[in-house]
Amino acid sequence: MTTMDNTPQGELVLRTLAMPADTNANGDIFGGWLMSQMDIGGAILAKEIAHGRVVTVRVEGMTFLRPVAVGDVVCCYARCVKRGTTSISINIEVWVKKVASEPIGQRYKATEALFIYVAVDPDGKPRPLPVQG
C-alpha cells in the first residue's frame, strides 16, 4: 500500500487548499485534518458504489510520508480495492501540489491509508451493496 510512486492511483475525489487554521504546533498541516479530508473523499466514492448512505467503520495503515505546507493544494485520490457483501475497502492517497512554497509546482504523495465503509439503510443497519453491473 505504501509506495513512493510518482503517479496517483485512483480517481480524484477531493481537492482543497491547506489553510492556516489547519496547522499543528510545528506550522505544518495537522494530520487529523488530512485524515478528515481522506474520509470525506473516500466516502464520496463509497456512496457512489453503494448507491446511498455509508459509514466509516475502520481505517488501516495510515502512513504519513511527508508534511504538508499552508497554501498548498491537497488532492485525495481514491480507488476501490475490495467489495464485500456490505463493505467497501477504499485505498486513499493524498497528493500535494506545491503552489505556495518551494519548489513551486512539485507534486508528491503526503499520506495514504485504507478506509473501510459499510453501506447502511435508513435505520443505520448494514445493507447489501447493489450488484455490480
UniProtKB/Swiss-Prot annotation:
SUPFAM superfamilies, alphabetized: Thioesterase/thiol ester dehydrase-isomerase (SSF54637)
EC number(s) recorded for this UniProt protein: 3.1.2.-
Keyword Hydrolase appears in the UniProt entry: yes
Any one GO cellular component localisation term in the record: cytoplasm
Pfam family, one: 4HBT
Biological processes annotated in GO: acyl-CoA metabolic process; fatty acid catabolic process
GO MF terms, alphabetically ordered: long-chain fatty acyl-CoA hydrolase activity
All residue ranges annotated as the HotDog ACOT-type domain in the record: 8-123
Coiled coil: none
InterPro entries the record matches: Cytosol_ACT (IPR040170), HOTDOG_ACOT (IPR033120), HotDog_dom_sf (IPR029069), Thioestr_dom (IPR006683)
Keywords: Hydrolase
The protein's role, per its UniProt record: Catalyzes the hydrolysis of the thioester bond in palmitoyl-CoA and malonyl-CoA.
Family: Belongs to the acyl coenzyme A hydrolase family.
Protein name: Acyl-CoA thioester hydrolase YciA
